[in-house]
A protein has these predicted regions:
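N-terminal secretory signal peptides and thylakoid transit peptides that target proteins
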Residues: 1-11
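Beta1/beta-strand and adjacent pyrophosphate-binding region of the FAD-binding site
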Residues: 28-42, 58
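C-terminal structured subdomain/cap of oxidoreductase catalytic cores
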Residues: 28-29, 47-49, 55, 349-350, ...
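Conserved N-terminal/central alpha/beta ligand/cofactor-binding core
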Residues: 56, 62-173, 177-179, 302, ...
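Conserved redox-cofactor binding core of oxidoreductases
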Residues: 118-202, 221-224, 270-271, 279-280, ...
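A glycine-rich dinucleotide-binding beta-alpha-beta segment and adjacent secondary-structure elements
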Residues: 182, 397-481, 485
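Glycine-rich loop(s) and the adjacent beta-strand/alpha-helix scaffold that form part
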Residues: 199-202, 206-276, 488, 492-501
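An anion/pyrophosphate-binding glycine-rich loop and adjacent beta-alpha core
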Residues: 247-249, 256-390
Length: 512
């Protein structure tokens, strides 16, 4: 399985160029055609399309570097693309529309979905015309759909740097460390611009004929996470800076918010361990506990905080995440000394997103696990009763769970959740081990209700003029789960296509 995200230091190094920190000693005013809020994949795509159309364009980025979540994507979704046709991948917009609508039980915006799907192949052509190259079309799943168009080199920072150079070459401005604070809205409810600030706190008023909101959702805002997500303890495993600025501005402008409880789920991670210690600052460096994370990821027994098994442990990330949400967002991997020896001597059967290859021998298990015990996310005991006491589980429930697992393993039949029998393991020989995990998310995917042109809608279905919402600030694409298993790369594609297509509509809007 491919690694889905690089981490920040590599992305920062790749994107320091192509942006300006605007320094001014007093409040200033700027007049533009298009103002884009957010310089991630969606915002940069919008900026590229806007300068291509000849619009005087400014992109605002609150962080000191550009790219956001765009630096972390490895590929993007499309159907019916040139690359898929070349490789005889028989997926088109109609087939994918039916598949996605069925997955979401028709509780999503079908018109917006259909329009986006039909444009994804054209957007791949558009990206290639701008010098963005692809390695091919892949899937991370044995039975997945080949929709994931992998960027050359395996990461999206190439798109960010390429677009930054081209945008500035065509006269567009990219202002870093310049967060948008509020929208300028006239008495009729039409958005007329943005008020931002620079590093020194001085105000920048941007009068714009059209505004595009692309701030990446709210996964880094604990208050919004607690308010909207099923598990209040969700931590972000994705890009920093996603604090819900755009969603909040859209709501204040009158937009209806939809699917606010849905995230791009990252599964179970080591409880209370910083992301960089699990996944590394650049995908490798500093990933001290990545093998323990991979051990947690293995398809062996997982139990609730009470000690009950709660799912087929081989489920895809979005499904196992949903199951974990139902038990409170936290769970334990439980195994015995025989499984420990298997991980050390035979290897980890499942890899972890390119960071740990399948079959890797966990030869430093004892050292890392001992560190985990000291830090409070790993547990070791000579009996199940003692393990239950250490973890806070109910001893009787854990004992019953283990006895049932041992019997199912002996019978080579999971009659509880019907997991493939090759992944059944007895928990019989002490010492016994537990690793505590909690849910994390790469990004939230709920936001403003939009039409097929990415225009925000009020609760009554009225278009809010002068503004567009794209990427993770636009809701309506997902009902209760991110559909990674059938449509890999949709979050980035929704953003990139939203950037291009919103500008296509701006061309019509500004002619009126």
């Amino acid at each position: 399985m491919q690694r889905r995200f690089m981490l920040l230091s590599l992305a920062v190094a790749a994107t320091l160029g192509g942006s300006t920190t605007l320094a001014f000693a007093a409040d200033q005013t700027m007049n533009v055609d298009v103002c884009v809020v957010g310089a991630g994949a969606g915002g940069m795509s919008a900026g590229m399309a806007a300068v291509d159309a000849g619009y005087n364009t400014v992109i605002l980025e609150k962080l000191g570097v550009i790219g956001g979540g765009g630096n972390f994507m490895e590929g993007t979704f499309a159907v019916g693309s040139r690359l898929q046709i070349k490789d005889n991948v028989g997926i088109n917009a109609e087939k994918q529309f039916k598949r996605v609508m069925d997955f979401h039980h028709w509780r999503i915006n079908g018109k917006a979905l259909n329009n986006w799907l039909k444009e994804t192949a054209t957007t791949i052509d558009w990206l290639e015309a701008h010098g963005i190259n692809f390695e091919g079309v892949h899937t991370a799943f044995i039975d997945g759909n080949r929709t994931w168009h992998m960027f050359e080199g395996g990461h999206g920072s190439s798109l960010i740097t390429n677009f930054a150079e081209k945008i500035e070459a065509k006269g567009g401005k990219i202002l870093t460390s310049t967060p948008a604070q509020s929208l300028i809205i006239d008495k009729d409810g039409t958005v007329r611009g943005v008020v931002a600030t620079n590093e020194d706190g001085n105000k920048l008023t941007i009068n714009a004929k059209a505004v595009i909101i692309a701030t990446g959702g709210f996964s880094c805002n604990p208050e919004m996470v607690k308010k909207y997500l099923p598990y209040a303890g969700y931590e972000s495993a994705g890009s920093p800076g996603r604090t819900g600025d755009g969603v909040q501005m859209l709501e204040k402008a009158g937009a209806k918010l939809v699917n606010m409880n849905v995230t791009m789920q990252a599964g179970l991670w080591l409880k209370d361990v910083p992301t960089e210690l699990q996944f590394g600052k650049d995908g490798l460096t500093g990933a001290t506990y990545v093998r323990l994370l991979a051990a947690l990821f293995q398809p062996y027994l997982k139990v609730s905080p009470k000690g009950d098994r709660f799912a087929d442990e081989t489920l895809p990330l979005e499904y196992i995440s949903n199951a974990a949400e139902e038990i409170g967002g936290e769970a334990f991997a439980v195994f015995d000394d025989n499984t420990r020896k298997e991980m050390i001597n035979v290897g980890l059967p499942r890899g972890y997103f390119g960071m740990v290859a399948p079959g890797t021998k966990f030869d430093n298990f004892d050292k890392l696990f001992a560190e985990g015990v000291k830090k409070g996310f790993c547990y070791k005991a000579n009996s199940l009763k003692e393990l239950a006491k250490l973890t806070g589980m109910d001893p009787k429930r854990l004992q019953n769970t283990v006895e049932r697992m041992n019997q199912m393993t002996k019978n080579q039949k999971d009659d509880e959740f019907y997991k493939d029998s090759q992944w059944l393991r007895e928990v019989k020989k002490g010492p016994f081990y537990a690793i505590k995990g909690s849910l994390r998310t790469y990004a939230t995917v709920g936001g403003a209700s939009v039409n097929e042109h990415f225009q925000p809608l009020t609760p009554e279905g009225k278009v809010i003029k002068g503004i567009y919402a794209i990427g993770q600030d636009a809701g309506g694409l997902y009902s209760d789960s991110y559909d990674m298993h059938i449509a890999e790369g949709t979050a980035s594609s929704w953003a990139i296509n939203g950037g291009r297509l919103s500008v296509e509509h701006i061309k019509t809007y500004l002619k009126k």
